């Protein structure tokens, strides 16, 4: 047998070759994403021109020409407006934010009692951070403390009683109200939404009809209407002398509205589960609730994590609508302070809205990034 007729047997593994020079690095990314076609080149040039024009103006207005400290509006107004700045001046009035910062966070909460919401915030962070870390131990205990124990402690600290001065909810406001509304809405909407989604897929006609009616009615009206009904119409159906706290009405309205949307998100995840998963669970002899808890629901939630977090983000932003029922969240308390004569100037409203927008963006961006992290962490599917 000649050498040419012998079968080839590899005795060593060749080292991996690096990719071609033009396929990696920043230059390759720019060529592939920004300069791939003539249309991309034109759009890139226009975008760079817009950035080159806007960024210096924004930096100048937000930082260089900005007023960082001052006792009143005169530091944020020109001489023609009764201030000390030269005519033609324009810049952010961060002194307004600095002077009203405590009110933006706590609303009209009594100054001497603001240590109470501060403690609630610290407890919330201490319980939330381990909950967000996938590898953290004792998740069950952590969840009980966060969603069952903390609300009781928070209500006692924020509202008062049992030795603490009572602070009525009309005095609450600012970021504190935004976080309370969004946390309760999110914490209630997920389990209620799961039950509604399961009820809508139920084989029992009465339960299915009730869930479908609830979901479609709530989804068919705007949140403003739900809040108005909860605030104005709900007391009309209560016995004489009964009075439901305004904040509680808002919490009920936000929770109901978010639950209806969450139910449709969860239902979409349930419909995406292959039929074989249901049949496999049945073949193991699992009951309905065992099958749902152990096999079906974990997969459904994993599939719709982006939509769930998107609903959470929408809930956080929708809390600003409570101003129509006389409550002042972060945005509402910022806008309320525009009428303060001591800080009335042309740049005060713009600065206040930028501050509120940045706070909202910070929370929403954090939720979005965590959603992406959880998607990657739970991406256990088999890909070809």
Swiss-Prot record:
An annotated GO BP: amino acid transport
Any one Pfam family match given in the protein's UniProt record, by short name: BPD_transp_1
Keyword entries, A-Z: Amino-acid transport, Cell inner membrane, Cell membrane, Membrane, Transmembrane, Transmembrane helix, Transport
GO MF term set: transmembrane transporter activity
SUPFAM superfamilies named among the record's database cross-references: MetI-like
Keyword Transmembrane among UniProt keywords: yes
Protein topology in the membrane: Multi-pass membrane protein
Domain annotation ABC transmembrane type-1: ranges: 175-364
Chief place of localization: membrane
Stated family: Belongs to the binding-protein-dependent transport system permease family. HisMQ subfamily.
Identification of the protein by name: General L-amino acid transport system permease protein AapM
Organism: Rhizobium johnstonii (strain DSM 114642 / LMG 32736 / 3841)
């Amino acid at each position: 047998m000649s050498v040419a007729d012998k079968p080839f047997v590899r005795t060593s593994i060749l080292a991996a070759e690096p990719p071609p020079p033009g396929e990696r690095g920043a230059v390759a990314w720019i060529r592939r994403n920004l300069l791939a076609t003539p249309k991309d080149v034109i759009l890139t040039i226009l975008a760079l021109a817009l950035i080159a024009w806007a960024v210096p103006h924004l930096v100048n207005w937000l930082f260089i020409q900005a007023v960082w400290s001052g006792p009143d509006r005169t530091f944020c107004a020109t001489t023609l407006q009764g201030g000390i700045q030269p005519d033609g001046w324009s810049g952010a009035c961060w002194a307004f934010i600095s002077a009203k910062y405590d009110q933006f966070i706590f609303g009209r909460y009594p100054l001497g009692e603001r240590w109470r919401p501060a403690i609630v915030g610290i407890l919330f962070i201490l319980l939330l951070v381990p909950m967000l870390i996938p590898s953290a131990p004792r998740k069950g205990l952590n969840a009980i403390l966060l969603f069952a124990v903390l609300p009781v402690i928070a209500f006692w600290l924020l509202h008062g009683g049992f030795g603490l001065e009572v602070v009525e909810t009309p005095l609450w406001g600012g970021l504190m109200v935004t976080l309370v509304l969004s946390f309760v809405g999110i914490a209630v909407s997920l389990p209620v939404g799961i039950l509604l989604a399961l009820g809508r897929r139920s084989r029992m006609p009465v339960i299915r009809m009730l869930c479908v009616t609830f979901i479609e009615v709530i989804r068919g009206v705007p949140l403003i209407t739900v809040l108005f009904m909860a605030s104005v119409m709900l007391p009309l159906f209560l016995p004489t002398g009964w009075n439901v706290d305004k904040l509680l009405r808002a919490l009920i309205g936000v929770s109901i509205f978010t639950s209806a949307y969450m139910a449709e998100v969860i239902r979409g995840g349930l419909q995406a589960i292959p039929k074989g998963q249901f049949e496999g669970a049945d073949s193991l002899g699992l009951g309905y609730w065992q099958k749902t808890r152990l096999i079906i629901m974990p997969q459904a939630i994993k599939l719709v994590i982006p939509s769930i977090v998107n609903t959470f983000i929408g809930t956080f932003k929708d809390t600003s609508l409570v101003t129509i029922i006389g409550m002042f969240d972060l945005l509402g308390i910022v806008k309320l302070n525009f009428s303060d004569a001591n800080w009335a100037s042309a740049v005060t409203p713009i600065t206040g809205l930028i501050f509120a927008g940045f706070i909202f963006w910070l929370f929403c961006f954090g939720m979005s990034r965590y959603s992406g992290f959880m998607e990657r962490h739970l991406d256990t599917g088999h890909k070809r």
